[in-house]
Amino acid sequence: RGLGDVYKRQDVSNIASAFATYSDKFNVKKICVGRDCRLSSERIFNALTDKLIDYGLSIFDVGIVTTPVLYFSLFTMDVDGGIMITASHNPPDYNGFKASIGKNVLSSNQIQELKILIRKKDYIIPTEKGSIEKIYMIDNDIDDLNKRISISKKIRVGIDCANTPIGLFVNKVFKKLGCESYILFEEPDGNFPNHHPDPSIESNLSSLKDLVLEKKLDIG
């Protein structure tokens, strides 16, 4: 991870080239790529996928999603890996990559191997063009959750989306589970105008606490 503006197009191209080279050893041909709503994510996504296509990879664009939705796609689609463009709970000017081969996230040692490839520019030579296709995974993920989780009584729940991608579908999740939901900061916004999306900082929970108390909710 690093500052999003630090990832110039050539830097992202080098990361894509290193991933394509390293994953070629594992016969990776098809991958899912997702991104969060940070201001730099779309630009990084375009640079990354353009280069991966140059290396012959078939890309399934799962859109603006949470990291768990990207991981869900690895287990439910016929793909060989995936990349999530995100900086998780870091400030809005940060961004980064979470890469997987098969169903496993790259280890720290594997990431160091990518770093060596980038330093040496020791990339495979592309032989054919790949492709890109948009895929909508969120409804499949919600249906899977609904099959796995059952709630015996109606729960009144408050959710603070912190202007992150979860706001795109969280209401659907709880509605299908039969919950009564009250949602804060639902609209994805890479500026995170209401608060930093880090729930480990107690001050970021103040609006949610107020909501739970005001509405007398069961949980938040």
Predicted regions and their residues:
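Glycine-rich phosphate/diphosphate-binding loops that line cofactor/substrate pockets in enzymes
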Residues: 16-31, 148-152
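Short, small-residue-biased leader/transition segments that mark boundaries at the very start
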Residues: 2-7
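A conditional alpha-helix N-cap/helix-loop micro-motif detector
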Residues: 12-13, 63, 138, 201
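Short, highly selective alpha-helical patches that border small-molecule cofactor pockets
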Residues: 12, 16, 41, 45, ...
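Well-ordered alpha-helical segments embedded in enzymatic catalytic cores
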Residues: 11-18, 69, 141-144, 204-207
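Residue-level detector of alpha-helical secondary structure
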Residues: 14-21, 47, 51
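N-terminal small/polar loop signature for handling phosphorylated ligands or for N-terminal nucleophile
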Residues: 28-94, 173-220
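Gly/Ser/Thr-enriched, mixed-charge loops and adjacent short helices
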Residues: 95-217
